Amino acid sequence: MGTPCQSARGPRTTPLPHCPPPCLPGAPDQQTRRLPPGWGQRTAPTQVGLADAASPDELQDQASGARPGGGNRVGAGRGRPGTPAPSRQSRRTGPAEQADHAHSNPTGGCSDPQRSPRTRQAGYALGEGSAGLGSRGPRPHPAFQVQWSARNPGCPRTWRRRSGAQRGHPPPGAGQRPSGPTGGRPAAPGAPGTPAAPGPGGGAAVPSGATPHPERGSGPADPPAAARLPPERQEPRLPQDLAAAQRCPAGPPPTRSGAAAQRTHRRPPGCPRSARNPGCPRTWRRRSGAQRGHPPPGAGQRPSGPTGGRPAAPGAPGTPAAPGPGGGAAVPSGATPHPERGSGPADPPAAARLPPERQEPRLPQDLAAAQRCPAGPPPTRSGAAAQRTHRRPPGCPRSARNPGCPRTWRRRSGAQRGHPPPGAGQRPSGPTGGRPAAPGAPGTPAAPGPGGGAAVPSGATPHPERGSGPADPPAAARLPPERQEPRLPQDLAAAQRCPAGPPPTRSGAAAQRTHRRPPGCPRSARNPGCPRTWRRRSGAQRGHPPPGAGQRPSGPTGGRPAAPGAPGTPAAPGPGGGAAVPSGATPHPERGSGPADPPAAARLPPERQEPRLPQDLAAAQRCPAGPPPTRSGAAAQRTHRRPPGCPRSARNPGCPRTWR
């Protein structure tokens, strides 16, 4: 046998320094039991050099003494981490015999006398035997290490749900997302080990014809196979989104800090993502809105790329531009552009050629529709405003199909905001429990046709909200809302032309979403400024309750409704109303108590009153149900629905649509 220490049956002499622990004398099974945990179970058996022989037949060779010095280096490949490490033979034999193999083997446990266990462990770092103790699969080529991203780690809807739900906490591990050999920075296309240039002949070790890395792709390569499917057939997934962002002819969007980074420059009309403005509100809204307050993790870095987030000359080498077949600027005319990323002088993708009504509503098409707006992309604004920008012209699919008449979007995303809109459960309250009442039933704002509301002289159109006022709607308001040009100024104009007069002034965002106008009124009918606009405006300020929100519902009863007619209540403000109001006297409209007349200013019809905060409050108090309960924060404004009889109710301070 070799040196004295290597035979368990030989005389006990001093062990040599280079022998591994199992060589120490003792009962064979004890030796096996004393192995450090993990040695000999997961990876190649300890008795054989890790890099040298790990497969059953090699073990057998060595055990029979056939091959003294070192295992077969080619065979070492067969013992790669993926293979079941302990050989079948050693599993069949018990621990004692296993130990025996090591000792009947000519060089004992050290198949290479020059290497101590420590050196052998260092072999891991050199990538020799296994990728590490307990490693489960072959270590992939560095260029493919990030494939998880392409495998659609979840349709944006999912991600959004996942991260949005966690509001305030970035999705776990978010910061690390842009990883990979180059730490998330682009590398020179084709540099060894980069995920770059994944076309045939692309990244260093990608054999020509290999599938390029689907997400990081760059260089004059074809789009990845998955991307060649028309958008309908692709699963909508976040990475592809991101990819699309990069391949916009205008280059990636400029970097902004904070949440602004995501909703940045609208892409040029030719670009799908551009048009779909920078990512169909549905997605982006969901993505950014959900995490409101925390930019999506790593947002600042997202728009990177060879040109550092600035647009490059289309077709410049290494730009993410024009990814049609043959890459570079010139998409040969007639070539089908990449259906989602499409760019260059190409037609819109086939799916996009259908009129919006005939397309299935799906994220990509959303995007497409956005892009087909005759008015071109909306102007860029900074901050949250960027996403909810110019109204589309009446001809425009996105305006028409309203897939984001932000009324919808706002509602949709706002609703998913993680918290149900405050007070949601209570909202539909009132005498009829939120159900429509028989037209003309006493106390309802219903039946606003001739002969409708209680005391409206027959033939006069009642003011649907206040229930009085023989005024006709302004001429402009007689057009159906579709035929009116949607435009901000007219919005405002309409607000003034409401038979009910302008809305009371409030400070902060509240000022904009105020009382609903009667159906006759353009702004009313359009509900007070088709929430598309108003939503846009006020929604933007979301996050800070309009100043003073908490104090709003005050008054003698501290914001709680009081028994109608109780002394000092704001209740029953009709003739004969509050307790001490002499019958026939008009109660004080704001405090609703005492024999006082309303202040002179309050006697003017609303149109003639200057809009001012107190009157607002007054309106709140004059609700038969009393002022809304006080809530803190923004909740204060969108509170309980007033009963139909109440002016502020009717304009329901907050018809969720408005207030929301």
Swiss-Prot record:
Region (4 X 125 AA tandem repeats) residue spans:
149-648
What is the designated name of this protein?
Answer: Uncharacterized protein BHLF1
| Source species of the chain | Epstein-Barr virus (strain B95-8)
Q: Provide the alphabetized UniProt keywords.
A: Early protein, Repeat
Q: Does Iron-sulfur appear among the keywords?
A: no
Q: sequence repeats located where?
A: 149-273, 274-398, 399-523, 524-648
Annotated Polar residues bias: 104-116
Bias (Gly residues) ranges? 67-80
Query: Which segments show compositional bias classed as Low complexity?
Result: 177-196, 302-321, 427-446, 552-571
Instruction: Map out region (Disordered) in residue numbers.
Output: 1-660
